[in-house]
């Protein structure tokens, strides 16, 4: 029987071991990623927190909101991590695909389109939902084609009115904003 030299066998064994452990290590790293974002109203009042947790299948979003008006509010991820007093610096909805706005439009929806948040009479809301296709940390890949962790970050926005899931302007003014700070920021 012909045998490869010992050093080649060791290198081959090390490469096999690395190949077998790399995917689980990457999954553990993605699972560990979490960001908590504080939201403020235009007048600087505390509007609660939103936690983003990276999972193996996308990002779990948990929002605990306060000091908002009763009723439905549009809730979106915006393209730029900036909240100026009028929140316009956050830009438009996060939309790397160039899709139409809204879950009810034939042209798809923005990656940053999220379900409405329903605020109770006491001004509070708690909701959680899942956002597939995104990651909190790079690198982008086929499984997670879009990252919220680009150089200028992203923002989470609560709008004054409910989203009709069709028209971009149906949610009204921007009521509260928080910055999803990039990892290097």
Task: Describe the role of every protein-language-model region.
Residues 12-23:
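Bacterial N-terminal signal peptides
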Residues 2-14:
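Bacterial N-terminal signal peptides that target proteins for export
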Residues 2, 26-185:
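N-terminal leader/targeting pre-sequences
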């Amino acid at each position: 029987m012909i045998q490869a030299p010992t050093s080649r066998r060791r290198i081959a064994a090390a490469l096999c071991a690395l190949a077998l452990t790399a995917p689980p290590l990457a999954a553990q790293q993605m699972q560990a990623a979490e960001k908590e974002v504080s939201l403020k109203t235009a007048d600087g009042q505390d509007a609660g927190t939103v936690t983003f947790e990276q999972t193996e299948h996308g990002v779990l979003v948990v929002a605990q909101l306060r000091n908002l008006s009763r009723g439905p509010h549009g809730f979106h991820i915006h393209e730029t991590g900036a909240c100026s007093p009028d929140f316009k610096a956050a830009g438009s909805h996060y939309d790397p695909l160039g899709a139409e706005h809204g879950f009810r439009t034939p042209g798809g929806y923005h990656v940053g389109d999220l379900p409405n948040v329903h605020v109770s009479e006491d001004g509070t809301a708690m909701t959680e939902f899942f956002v597939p296709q995104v990651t909190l940390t790079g690198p982008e890949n086929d499984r997670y084609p879009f990252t919220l962790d680009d150089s200028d970050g992203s923002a989470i926005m609560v709008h004054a009115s409910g989203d009709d899931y069709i028209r971009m302007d149906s949610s009204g003014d921007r009521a509260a904003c928080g910055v999803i700070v990039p990892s290097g920021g």
